[in-house]
Each structure stands twice: as structure tokens, then as C-alpha cells.
Design a protein with these regions (language model features):
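N-terminal, positively charged, Ser/Thr/Ala/Gly-biased leader segments
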Residues: 1-24, 165-170
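Alpha-helical scaffold segments in soluble metabolic enzymes
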Residues: 20, 38, 99, 156, ...
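Acidic, glycine-rich flexible loop/linker segments
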Residues: 104-171
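Conserved phosphate/anionic-ligand binding catalytic regions in large, soluble enzymes, centered on
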Residues: 16, 67-73, 159-167
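Feature captures the catalytic cores and cofactor-binding loops of soluble hydro-lyases/lyases
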Residues: 3, 22, 28-133
Length: 171
């Protein structure tokens, strides 16, 4: 099974929408890989530079209502082709969250107090996810282990590598 985790990128803002994740002008690209350089291009966040800050990151930690806006699957694909396989937030737009699972990626919802704990660990945080146990381990200025909930069907989708792989295996 695929491993989930990596170095964390902190995006300290609520309501990051799919237009900020991947601008609409790039939706006509013919392959997922063609989306890669445009990740978070329109995100306005003090001092954030996607070309500099995304390199080597596998996890995004953010605030509430992540992935709101249009329901484009491209917003998940651009994370996939940039090797980001986990997004951790207080909440997600429903369709974005399901698109993550459908593509075999993790959208982990945590209470605000746990998000605050993660933000408090400093800039150099590494996340490891134990999908079977539904826990994540964050190592930064200290080490914390946080439990999360994931329903069985969505867990099966993620374990299979997404909806298509799950359907091939089960139908």
C-alpha cells in the first residue's frame, strides 16, 4: 500500500478555493502532468511563493473550508502530480474531499485545537500517517500523535489507490 505523509507545507488561511489551487485558465491542459507548474499560482498568502515553498512537500496543513468553489477534479490532480498526497484541515468542501478519496489521496479533518497544535510545531514538520490505525504522527519542535476519523468506504478507496482501482478490484 502507498505511504502517506511527508514534509508539511502550512497554508494559514480559511476558504482556499479551487481557483487558487489551480487557476481555471489551465483546465484545458491535456495531461495531469501539464498542470504541475501552476499549483497554487493564484494563492495570495503573505510571503508565499509556490515555486519555492512547495518543493519537497508531501502534506498540506491548512484551516477551514479547504477546496471550496468549483468542483473541479483538477484541484486534486495538481496535488497528485506535485507529490502532495495528504491535506489536513479543519474542514473541506464536500466535493473536494470526495475527489481526494476518489483519487487515492487523504483529506484528513481535525478539530481546530489539533490544527492549532500542528501549526504550533514550527516550520519544519514531518507527518507520517498510519491509515490502518487512523493516526498521524507529526514531528517538529516536539512529537505529537493525533487520531482522525475516516469512514470504512473512503478508507477502502484510498487503500485501493482511488475509485478506478477500487472498482477494478471489487466489481
Amino acid at each position: 500500500m502507498k505511504e502517506f505523509g511527508g514534509k508539511a507545507l502550512f497554508l494559514d488561511r480559511n476558504d482556499i478555493n479551487t481557483d487558487e489551487i489551480i487557476p481555471a485558465k489551465y483546465l484545458t491542459e491535456n495531461t495531469k502532468l501539464a498542470l504541475q507548474p501552476f499549483i497554487l499560482e493564484d494563492l495570495k498568502l503573505g510571503g508565499f511563493d509556490p515555486r519555492r515553498d512547495i518543493e519537497g512537500k508531501g502534506v498540506i496543513i491548512t484551516r477551514a473550508n479547504f477546496g471550496c468553489g468549483s468542483s473541479r477534479e483538477h484541484a486534486v490532480w495538481v496535488f497528485e502530480v506535485n507529490d502532495i498526497n495528504v491535506v489536513i484541515a479543519e474542514s473541506f468542501a464536500r466535493i473536494f474531499r470526495q475527489n481526494m478519496y476518489n483519487c487515492g489521496m487523504l483529506a484528513i479533518e481535525l478539530p481546530k485545537k489539533d490544527i492549532e497544535t500542528l501549526f504550533g510545531l514550527g516550520d519544519a514538520v514531518t507527518i507520517t500517517v498510519d491509515l490502518a490505525a487512523c493516526t498521524l504522527t507529526a514531528k517538529g519542535s516536539q512529537k505529537v500523535v493525533i487520531s482522525f476519523n475516516l469512514n470504512e468506504f473512503d478508507k477502502n478507496l484510498v487503500e485501493a489507490g482511488g475509485w478506478l482501482a477500487y472498482a477494478d478490484k471489487n466489481y
